[in-house]
Amino acid sequence: MFWLRFQVRGLENVPMSGGGLVLINHQSFLDPPLVALALQRPVSYLARDSLFRVPVIGWILRSTCVMAINRDAASTASIRMALQRMNDGFLVGLFPEGTRSNDGNVGEFKPGFISLIRRSNVPVYPVGIAGTHDAMPRGGVRFWPQKVRVVYGKQLCPDEVSRLSVKGNEDKLIAFVRSAVEACKDEAQAWRDGT
């Protein structure tokens, strides 16, 4: 991806081994490979099942450890597979917005990631990405040369994640995680803008 001026910060926040859940803002189809590329370790993503039926995209997804999930009814099989991957020492990447941003800003988080947090005992890492929306916006079929910045945040406080994972605290957990991802995205955007 030589046409992107791609830089990262915070790689030291994500260990080179051990399972974990990586929660990322979603701007473009470029996000999954770029986030994983810098980590230099496999990241298994969850993607909506309908993408697997798109000829070229489906082949790529099946070839790269992507797990299909039905967004209308998160299947227990997909959740079990993601939990198994994390328990086996892999990172599982998820875009809690559930779709790409229309304008590059962080959108509303869907609650689907909560079951993974509740049922796993792995670190949770927020990641923010800026610039991929301009490089390949939603609905775009062309790449545009852009500066892209990715910020890997520190592991979310396990005690706070555990406290907020209790039934009835879903809105607080979503707000806590969204705030951490948005802080990483804002840092990436400021770095990209040179401010």
Regions found by a protein language model. Name each.
Residues R5, G19, K147-R149:
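A residue-level signal for beta-strand positions that form part of recognition/binding surfaces
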Residues A77-T195:
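Non-catalytic C-terminal accessory region of glycerolipid acyltransferases
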Residues L11, Q27, G98-T99:
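A short, glycine- and basic residue-enriched loop/turn
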Residues F2, V14-A73, M81:
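Catalytic core of membrane glycerolipid acyltransferases/transacylases, capturing the structured
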Residues E12-P15, R142-F143:
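A short beta-turn/loop motif at secondary-structure boundaries
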Residues M1-R9, T132-A135:
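Short gly/ser/thr-rich secondary-structure transition/capping motifs
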Residues R5-F6, P42, M67, G89, ...:
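Secondary-structure boundary/capping positions in well-ordered alpha/beta enzyme cores
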